[in-house]
A protein has these predicted regions:
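Conserved short submotifs of the Hanks-type protein kinase catalytic core
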Residues: 223-237
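Short beta-strand micro-motifs within the conserved protein kinase catalytic domain, predominantly
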Residues: 213-226
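Catalytic-loop of the protein kinase fold
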Residues: 276, 280-296
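ATP-binding glycine-rich loop module of kinase domains
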Residues: 164-203
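The feature encodes a structural signal of leucine-rich repeats
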Residues: 1-3, 24-26, 47-49, 69-72, ...
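C-lobe/activation-segment region of protein kinase-like
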Residues: 303, 308-360
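Activation segment signature within eukaryotic-like protein kinase domains
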Residues: 268-269
Length: 384
C-alpha cells in the first residue's frame, strides 16, 4: 500500500479481502479514524506492532497465515469483534485481556491448545467459536444415518451461508415423495470454522423441539461434497432478526415493522433457554446465539439452527465448563434485550421479571450470572 495512505484521515472502513498481502500494512496504524478493517483470505503472516490503530472496533483476519498477534492488540480498547479463524495461531497474547469490550471472538481452525482463563473471563464476551484447534477433547462424536443421495432430487435454492447452500429437495422412498431441505457444505474454512465441526455439532446436539429436525447425512460422490438432510421448515416461519450491520457491529438489527406480543416473547425466551440448556448439558457451546438464527411464526413457535460456530468442550473441566456456559448466557441476555425491545405490549409483571432476568444475564461478573438450568426454572415459573 502507498506509504502516504494515512492521508485518508476520515477513512472509517477498509476492506481488502481476497488479495495477496503477506504483511498487514503498517501505514494503517496511522489512519486514526479506522473503525473496521478486513483482510479476509490473504496470505498475511506478520502484523507489525504499530499497524493496529487504537480506534479499531472490528478486525477481520479470517483465512490468513498468522502465527502470532502482536501484544499491541491489547491497546485496542474499543475492539468488539475479532475474526481470526483459519490461521496458524498457537496462542493469544495475554494483553488481549485489556480488550474488555470484546464481545465476539472467532478463533476456530487454528493451533490453539487451551483456552486461558483470562480469555474466558472477559466481561463482555458473548459469542465465542474455537472448534478445529488442538485443544484436547474427551468426546465421542455421535453419528447420523447415512442416506443414499439417489433418493433426492434437488429443487430450488432456499438460502446460502458461509459454510454451505441449502436446497429444497424431493425425497423418494419408492412409494411416496416427501419434501426436505439439504444443506450442501462448501468444504472450505469459514469465518466460524470447519464444516466438519458444524456437522458433528449438529448431530451431537440431538433431538429437541426447537432444533430443525435432522434426518441424516448424505454424500454427493460425483461432486465430492457432503450434506445434511433436514426437515423442511414450514412456510409460515420467518427470521426473527437480521445479522449485525457495520454500525451495530455485534448486535442484530430488526425490521421497523416487527412487533411481538408478550406471549410470543415469552415463548421464544423459553424455547431458546431450553435448547441452550440441552446443548450445554452435552458439552456444546453454540457460539452464535442470535435472533438472526431464530425462526418464529405468529404463534411464537420457535426453530433454531446454524451450528457453524458451535464448539465442543470437556464437561469434566469445571473451570472451562463454568465460563463457557456463562459466556453463552451473556449472548442469551442480549437476545432477551432484543425481544423486549420489539415487544409491542405495555409493561406488565411478566415483562418486568424478564427484564430483571436480562439484567442478570448481562452482568460483567460471570459468577453472578445464572446458568441455563436456573434460567429455565425462572421462565417456567413466569409462564405458569
Amino acid at each position: 500500500m502507498p506509504d502516504d495512505f494515512y492521508r485518508f484521515k476520515s477513512l472509517r472502513i477498509f476492506f481488502a479481502s481476497d488479495n495477496l498481502f503477506t504483511t498487514y500494512p503498517e501505514v494503517l496504524g496511522r489512519c486514526d479514524a479506522l473503525d473496521i478493517v478486513g483482510f479476509k483470505s490473504n496470505n498475511i503472516k506478520v502484523i507489525p506492532a504499530s499497524a493496529l490503530n487504537l480506534n479499531l472496533r472490528w478486525l477481520i483476519l479470517t483465512g490468513n497465515k498468522i502465527e502470532a498477534l502482536p501484544p499491541s492488540i491489547g491497546n485496542c480498547k474499543r475492539m468488539q469483534k475479532l475474526m481470526l479463524a483459519g490461521n496458524q495461531l498457537a496462542s493469544l497474547p495475554e494483553t488481549l485481556a485489556n480488550c474488555s469490550n470484546l464481545s465476539l471472538l472467532r478463533i476456530a481452525a487454528n493451533r490453539i491448545t487451551e483456552l486461558p482463563e483470562w480469555l474466558l473471563g472477559l466481561p463482555n464476551l458473548a459469542w465465542l467459536a474455537f472448534s478445529g484447534n488442538h485443544i484436547k477433547q474427551d468426546f465421542t462424536f455421535a453419528d447420523a444415518q447415512e442416506l443414499n443421495f439417489e433418493q433426492f432430487n434437488l429443487k430450488e435454492l432456499l438460502g446460502e451461508g458461509a459454510s454451505g447452500t441449502i436446497y429444497k429437495a424431493e425425497r423418494s422412498n419408492g412409494e411416496a415423495i416427501t419434501n426436505v431441505a439439504i444443506k450442501i457444505f462448501k468444504g472450505n474454512v469459514t469465518s466460524d470454522g470447519y464444516p466438519d465441526d458444524e456437522m458433528n455439532a449438529y448431530i451431537a446436539a440431538g433431538s429437541h423441539p426447537v432444533l430443525v429436525g435432522l434426518l441424516g447425512k448424505v454424500n454427493f460422490s460425483k461432486e465430492k461434497k457432503r450434506g445434511l438432510v433436514m426437515n423442511l421448515i414450514p412456510e409460515d416461519f420467518f427470521n426473527l432478526g437480521a445479522p449485525p450491520s457495520l454500525e451495530s457491529c455485534t448486535r442484530d438489527i430488526f425490521n421497523t415493522g416487527i412487533g411481538l406480543s408478550k406471549l410470543q416473547v415469552l415463548k421464544v425466551a423459553n424455547s431458546m433457554a431450553s435448547v441452550a440448556q440441552q446443548l450445554h448439558a452435552r458439552g456444546i457451546i453454540h457460539g452464535d446465539l442470535y435472533a438472526h438464527n431464530i425462526l418464529i411464526n405468529e404463534n411464537g413457535d420457535t426453530l433454531f439452527g446454524d451450528f457453524g460456530a458451535a464448539s465442543f468442550y470437556n464437561k469434566n473441566n469445571a473451570v472451562v465448563s463454568f465460563y463457557l456456559e456463562k459466556i453463552e448466557v451473556k449472548a442469551y441476555g442480549y437476545l432477551l434485550d432484543d425481544l423486549l425491545s420489539i415487544c409491542v405490549e405495555e409493561e406488565n409483571p411478566s415483562l418486568v421479571e424478564l427484564a430483571r432476568l436480562r439484567d442478570l444475564c448481562l452482568l460483567p461478573q460471570h459468577a453472578e450470572r445464572p446458568g441455563f438450568d436456573e434460567i429455565v426454572e425462572k421462565l417456567t415459573a413466569l409462564s405458569d
